[in-house]
Amino acid sequence: MACRCTQLQDTIDEVATQFYSSIHYLSSHHDFVPLPGQEKVSDSKVNPISAEELQFAQRDLAKDLVTKFMQIDTLINQLPGISTAPKHQLEKIKKLQNSIEEKQLERKSLESENEDLKLQLAKRIETFGRLSCVLFQP
């Protein structure tokens, strides 16, 4: 599962797409209303639907947008640290920094131990090579 920030960004992208799609749908399916004293105009790119269908579509699109915004709100509330006071967040950061420093020291110690073991192994291989040359010489 993706992290909360990624989910939030994906949901924001989805709501932006929904906004665009809603505006495009409504602008291509509305009916033209003439201004007083003018004739009703038309556009070949617009395929008008009835007023009832348009209202239903508007409500449906609005519900979808509200649902998406509720998902965004839920994701924001689930972000780490949202319900934590800044003081507690700083304490947690300090603990994590100390933990990182301890792990770095442990890593250096283990790297040093690893180098020592490599040297010991190299010496033993060298000793074994000399002994096998002496023992198996004709």
Swiss-Prot record:
Family stated for the protein in its record: Belongs to the Mediator complex subunit 21 family.
Originating gene: med21
Compartment(s) where it occurs, according to its Swiss-Prot or TrEMBL record: Nucleus
UniProt cross-references to InterPro entries, sorted A to Z: Med7/Med21-like, Mediator_Med21
Presence of the UniProt keyword GTP-binding in the record: no
This protein's record includes keyword Transmembrane helix: no
Pfam families, sorted: Med21
UniProtKB keywords: Activator, Coiled coil, Nucleus, Transcription, Transcription regulation
GO molecular function, one term: transcription coregulator activity
Biological role: Component of the Mediator complex, a coactivator involved in the regulated transcription of nearly all RNA polymerase II-dependent genes. Mediator functions as a bridge to convey information from gene-specific regulatory proteins to the basal RNA polymerase II transcription machinery. Mediator is recruited to promoters by direct interactions with regulatory proteins and serves as a scaffold for the assembly of a functional preinitiation complex with RNA polymerase II and the general transcription factors.
GO CC terms of this entry: mediator complex; nucleus
Gene Ontology process terms (BP): positive regulation of transcription initiation by RNA polymerase II; regulation of transcription by RNA polymerase II
Subunit record text: Component of the Mediator complex.
Coiled-coil residue spans: 87-128
Listed PANTHER family: MEDIATOR OF RNA POLYMERASE II TRANSCRIPTION SUBUNIT 21, RNA POLYMERASE II HOLOENZYME COMPONENT SRB7
Listed name of the protein: Mediator of RNA polymerase II transcription subunit 21
